Amino acid sequence: MAAAEPSPRRVGFVGAGRMAGAIAQGLIRAGKVEAQHILASAPTDRNLCHFQALGCRTTHSNQEVLQSCLLVIFATKPHVLPAVLAEVAPVVTTEHILVSVAAGVSLSTLEELLPPNTRVLRVLPNLPCVVQEGAIVMARGRHVGSSETKLLQHLLEACGRCEEVPEAYVDIHTGLSGSGVAFVCAFSEALAEGAVKMGMPSSLAHRIAAQTLLGTAKMLLHEGQHPAQLRSDVCTPGGTTIYGLHALEQGGLRAATMSAVEAATCRAKELSRK
């Protein structure tokens, strides 16, 4: 029998917003961590209510989270994070594994704000983590080994697909997948509205469009096909699909989509420099 995957006894969250709650919910649902072994902190009770409903422990003390948990996920707003790290730095030890989900805060900045040799990772999730179907990338700091990386990847797979990448890819992931959720929604909306134009009721059209995206994504992931191959499989000579694809090409779908990812990535890099 294969050895059980390692799992920390306690996981802490500093910041208790929607993404933190989604990650905690995924960990609990997947049985990776028991609810009573999760401790979350926030300045007020407003965001802590979700953690309390999950059966997690809560506090208003960020230092208490660090003193109780060796794996801590920082899910604060980026502009707040430096002050939070300064607050908890006195209780950080070399035993801690600290994870930041704050967009635009580099590993070098995190390491500068924390004691020497602190083990730090950056994680960038996207909104579908809320339904445990997220696309997540993580980048490790200078003092993080493969065992810590594998542990975090094992945990985050409770929230979707998790890939380790060089830090240089994190901003690209923002353009591709963070912002990509909105791009896909825009396409799904347009797909459904095309059906509405042709006479289908709106609610039905939107359900079918969303299911079409879901089914297509599963085929690409489960069968390992390149999108071009699946697209070719759907086309028949002189059939409906090739006529529709021609219309998309005339509308510049590919170029517009590539430009959208490029624009979002450039903006992410710009924000990272501020």
Swiss-Prot record:
Places the protein is found: Cytoplasm
Pathway: Amino-acid biosynthesis; L-proline biosynthesis; L-proline from L-glutamate 5-semialdehyde: step 1/1
Gene Ontology terms describing biological process: L-proline biosynthetic process
Reactions listed under catalytic activity: L-proline + NADP(+) = (S)-1-pyrroline-5-carboxylate + NADPH + 2 H(+); L-proline + NAD(+) = (S)-1-pyrroline-5-carboxylate + NADH + 2 H(+)
GO terms assigned for molecular function: identical protein binding; pyrroline-5-carboxylate reductase activity
GO cellular component: cytosol; intercellular bridge; mitotic spindle
Keywords: Acetylation, Amino-acid biosynthesis, Cytoplasm, NADP, Oxidoreductase, Proline biosynthesis
Modified residues (N-acetylalanine): 2
Regulation: Competitive inhibition by proline analog N-formyl-L-proline. Weakly inhibited by proline.
Enzyme class: oxidoreductase
Keyword Amino-acid biosynthesis attached: yes
Matches recorded under InterPro entries: 6-PGluconate_DH-like_C_sf, NAD(P)-bd_dom_sf, P5C_Rdtase_cat_N, P5CR-like_CS, P5CR_dimer, Pyrroline-COOH_reductase
Pfam family name, one: F420_oxidored
Keyword presence, Oxidoreductase: yes
Record-listed E.C. numbers: 1.5.1.2
Family assignment from sequence similarity: Belongs to the pyrroline-5-carboxylate reductase family.
Quaternary structure note: Homodecamer; composed of 5 homodimers.
Database matches in PANTHER family: PYRROLINE-5-CARBOXYLATE REDUCTASE, PYRROLINE-5-CARBOXYLATE REDUCTASE 3
Function: Oxidoreductase that catalyzes the last step in proline biosynthesis, which corresponds to the reduction of pyrroline-5-carboxylate (P5C) to L-proline using NAD(P)H. Proline is synthesized from either glutamate or ornithine; both are converted to P5C, and then to proline via pyrroline-5-carboxylate reductases (PYCRs). PYCR3 is exclusively linked to the biosynthesis of proline from ornithine.
Name under which the protein is recorded: Pyrroline-5-carboxylate reductase 3
Biological source species: Homo sapiens (Human)
